[in-house]
């Protein structure tokens, strides 16, 4: 927990129990691309009494401080992941909401070449590729209205 205290202070944030608990949940291995609602449910499951409004507020503070990265994937729901040192892109299933992170040097090179050809010095970018799971039919158990809920890492 000392590392989390240091990380919060380094980001210019006061160390509070809600911030520490939310950071702790975000560090769990299965909690990549988690929504505020799913994070809140996980805290409740852990017996923590942190309100949903506090979860939203802390996630916004973490986003502003660079601790988390906010993604707005198809479906309109913001999801958060701890900010990583290495750049990666995302594949997203439109049916079940599964998110796959990947890196491809040839794609990165091509994007820089295109930007340069148009006189742009690339400083950052996001690449989201949307499709449907190729193996099996994830739609049998996931309807479009529940795809994000069913993709929760807290199932």
Swiss-Prot record:
Zn(2+) binds at residues 33, 81, 90, 93, 96, 101. InterPro entries: FUR (IPR002481), Fur_C (IPR043135), WH-like_DNA-bd_sf (IPR036388), WH_DNA-bd_sf (IPR036390). Disulfide bonds: none annotated. Its main location: cytoplasm. Fe cation binds at residues 87, 89, 108, 125. One of its GO terms (molecular function) is DNA-binding transcription factor activity. The keyword DNA-binding applies. Homodimer. This is Ferric uptake regulation protein. It comes from Klebsiella pneumoniae. The lineage of its organism: Bacteria, Pseudomonadati, Pseudomonadota, Gammaproteobacteria, Enterobacterales.
């Amino acid at each position: 927990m000392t590392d989390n205290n240091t990380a919060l202070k380094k980001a210019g944030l006061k160390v509070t129990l809600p911030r520490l608990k939310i950071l702790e949940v975000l560090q769990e291995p299965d909690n990549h691309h988690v929504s505020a609602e799913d994070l809140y449910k996980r805290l409740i499951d852990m017996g923590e009494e942190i309100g949903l409004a506090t979860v939203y507020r802390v996630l916004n503070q973490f986003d502003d401080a660079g601790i988390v990265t906010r993604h707005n994937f198809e479906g309109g729901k913001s999801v958060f992941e701890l900010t990583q040192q290495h750049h990666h892109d995302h594949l997203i299933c439109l049916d079940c909401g599964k998110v796959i992170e990947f890196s491809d040097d040839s794609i990165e090179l091509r994007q820089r070449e295109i930007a340069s050809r148009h006189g742009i010095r690339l400083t950052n970018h996001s690449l989201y590729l949307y499709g449907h799971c190729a193996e099996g039919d994830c739609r049998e158990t996931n309807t479009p209205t529940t795809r994000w809920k069913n993709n929760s890492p807290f199932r």
